[in-house]
């Protein structure tokens, strides 16, 4: 293992980033930019497939303009392929990060994120999640169970609103 400056952290970010479009991807890219500006080392990891294409009829889940100011993320995680969940978890663990930060907004991602978080924590890696939605606005069967499966696997939760904090309390966190 290489020696590192105690004040500078190695932070892995997991979630949608370039080439994916949308506010969540933009948020993670800006978060990475801010961390880099403060001298931290970042390792961004994103999806090979975020959603099945059938969920995007007539439009794309990718940005039209391929330009980004963030580092190119490693595209490892396929939300529909559990083998990539293990591969991503192993890869993140080998990076020896100080912390892995997930971006969470819907229970669809909970199985993959939950498995990865548990794998990392068993290896002594801290896991923190920025939570946009702890519970969906229109709940479906399994949303509560899936959400708690992932969120309970985290060392820390960062909320973006009082409403989300209330939802976490409702879930017993």
Name what the model sees in each region.
Residues 126-128, 133-153:
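Nucleotide-sugar donor phosphate/pyrophosphate-binding loop at the beta->alpha transition
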């Amino acid at each position: 293992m290489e020696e590192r400056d105690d004040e500078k952290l190695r932070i892995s970010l997991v979630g949608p980033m370039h080439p994916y479009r949308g506010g969540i991807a933009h948020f993670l890219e800006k978060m990475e930019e801010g961390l880099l500006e403060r001298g931290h080392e970042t390792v961004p990891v994103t999806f090979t497939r975020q959603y099945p294409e059938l969920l995007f009829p007539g439009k794309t889940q990718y940005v039209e303009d391929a330009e980004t100011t963030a580092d190119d993320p490693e595209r490892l995680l396929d939300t529909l392929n559990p083998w990539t969940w293990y591969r991503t978890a192993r890869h993140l663990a080998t990076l020896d990060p100080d912390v892995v930060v997930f971006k969470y907004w819907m229970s669809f991602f909970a199985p993959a994120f939950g498995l990865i978080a548990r794998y990392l924590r068993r290896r002594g890696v801290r896991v923190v999640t920025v939570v946009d939605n702890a519970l969906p606005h229109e709940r479906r069967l399994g949303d509560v169970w899936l959400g708690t499966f992932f969120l309970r696997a985290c060392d820390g939760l960062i909320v973006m609103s009082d409403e989300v904090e209330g939802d976490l309390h409702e879930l017993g966190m």
